[in-house]
Amino acid sequence: MAKKNAQIPSKPLEQGIVPPHSLEAEQSVLGGILIHPAHWDSISDMLIADDFYLAAHRVIFQEMENLLRQGKPIDLINLYEFLREKNLSEDVGGFAYLAELSKNTPSVSNIVSYAAIVRDRAILRDLISVSNDVAQSCYTTKGMEVKDILDEAERKVFAISEKRTTSNEGPQNICAILEKTIDRIELLSKTEGHNGITGVSTGFDALDKKTAGLQPSDLIIVAARPSMGKTTFAMNLCENAALKSDKPVLVFSLEMPAEQIMMRSLASLSRVDQTKIRTGQGLDQSDWSKIGSTMGLFANKPNLYIDDSSGLTPTELRSRARRVYRENGGLSLIMVDYLQLMRAPGFADNRTLEIAEISRSLKALAKELEVPVIALSQLNRTLENRADKRPVNSDLRESGSIEQDADLIMFIYRDEVYNENSEDKGVAEIIIGKQRNGPIGRVRLAFRGQFSRFDNLAEQRDIRDDY
């Protein structure tokens, strides 16, 4: 059954202007259901009662839904008696109007087309209503900053879109699903060179074997305590995707300026000590040659976008991601550093609900654009009090919603951070705490902090040879 979405405001439109509507389409939808009640299932996912312009039509549609909820069939007599018992029959024109709806419906077989007309007119009215709200906010700001008014306007427009967007076509017969599945398997089996990687390669062999790559529409959480290297690890994933994929990578760096991110990437790909790059001191001819080679890689394939705006809202981030997506015909990967630095207007008094809204919006973005979204996250300090300081899912700060929304959760643990005499110096564990469509477990990587780089554990070759 269709449900009303309370996010869409119900405001009166400007007086003297008739809002978009089609009484004929509304009558044909209602009449079609009365003539052939089975058609309810064809249109109930498309419409809600508030989509009807005429008040009587809203009542009729709502009471049809209520009839079905009580397990009663929809027909002329049942509906009329149901309305009469609630003292609503006269509000809809009585039995005569219901009979007229049944009599004057042009073609029951076209009911889906009529429903689409009703839905589209309702969307136009929603847009007009939101526009009026925005105009009113602009005339009387009530102390709001322009940035907040703009964010609220975009949120309301997106709410209309989100209300109407469905992620699938409803129930499908297993034969149709099986056919698509076999086609997908056959395509993968005939594609050479993917080595079982069905998503965006991480650049790390052992991790790719565990995950089959970073999958489209997945929300991927990378979490660690400070100094473990979560930004370095996430940027390594982005660098690999940017240089190997046909479509660009978009990085939202809410904590670090774009130039610092770029310095880290130069150190990572050039294998030049990042302290030399950061200070400009001690660089020899060999270092400059390596840096020049890396710059050539980016010049030949400028596939990395960095937005270092701080305090982004989900609406702002989504808008910017859509723009880059549209301008480039797609994206291969989105990374957010880090989730807790985002803000969601309207949730200032409840941090848990704010994080839930941010997490939900990032997952929605991944599904909308069909792109893997990596979000870095902080961990609770309480794990520092344990003997085994390897993170688990419950260590995620404001963990409930993040853990629920994530498709893949990866923690970074380096024993040498806690144990000065560790036998695993220069080794990092990538702990897969959750994987919706794959195994959990651990992967060991080499950590080369001076280069701002993680590597396959036994790897000593020059990574630039890959690109």
Curated annotation (Swiss-Prot):
Keywords in alphabetical order, please.
ATP-binding, DNA replication, DNA-binding, Helicase, Hydrolase, Isomerase, Nucleotide-binding, Primosome
Catalysed transformations (reactions):
Couples ATP hydrolysis with the unwinding of duplex DNA at the replication fork by translocating in the 5'-3' direction. This creates two antiparallel DNA single strands (ssDNA). The leading ssDNA polymer is the template for DNA polymerase III holoenzyme which synthesizes a continuous strand; ATP + H2O = ADP + phosphate + H(+)
| CDD domains listed in its UniProt record | DnaB_C
Q: Which family does it belong to?
A: Belongs to the helicase family. DnaB subfamily.
For whether the record's keyword set contains Isomerase, the answer is yes
The molecular function terms in GO held by this entry are: ATP binding; ATP hydrolysis activity; DNA binding; DNA helicase activity
Per its database record, what is this protein's job?
A: The main replicative DNA helicase, it participates in initiation and elongation during chromosome replication. Travels ahead of the DNA replisome, separating dsDNA into templates for DNA synthesis. A processive ATP-dependent 5'-3' DNA helicase it has DNA-dependent ATPase activity.
| EC category name | isomerase
Name by which UniProt lists this protein: Replicative DNA helicase DnaB
Is the keyword Nucleotide-binding assigned to this protein?
yes
What region holds the SF4 helicase domain?
A: 193-461
Q: Which GO terms describe its cellular component?
A: cytosol; primosome complex
The family database entries (PANTHER family) matched by this protein are listed as: REPLICATIVE DNA HELICASE (PTHR30153:SF2), REPLICATIVE DNA HELICASE DNAB (PTHR30153)
**What EC number(s) has UniProt assigned to this enzyme?**
5.6.2.3
- Which superkingdom does the taxonomy of this entry point to? Bacteria
Q: Name one GO biological process term.
A: DNA replication, synthesis of primer
Specify the taxonomic lineage: Bacteria, Pseudomonadati, Pseudomonadota, Gammaproteobacteria, Pasteurellales
Q: Do you know which InterPro entries this protein is assigned to?
A: AAA+_ATPase, DNA_heli_DnaB-like_N_sf, DNA_helicase_DnaB, DNA_helicase_DnaB-like_C, DNA_helicase_DnaB-like_N, DNA_helicase_N/primase_C, P-loop_NTPase
Task: Please tell me the species this chain comes from.
Answer: Pasteurella multocida (strain Pm70)
Residues recorded as binding ATP, renumbered to this chain, are 224-231
- Assembly and oligomerization: Homohexamer.
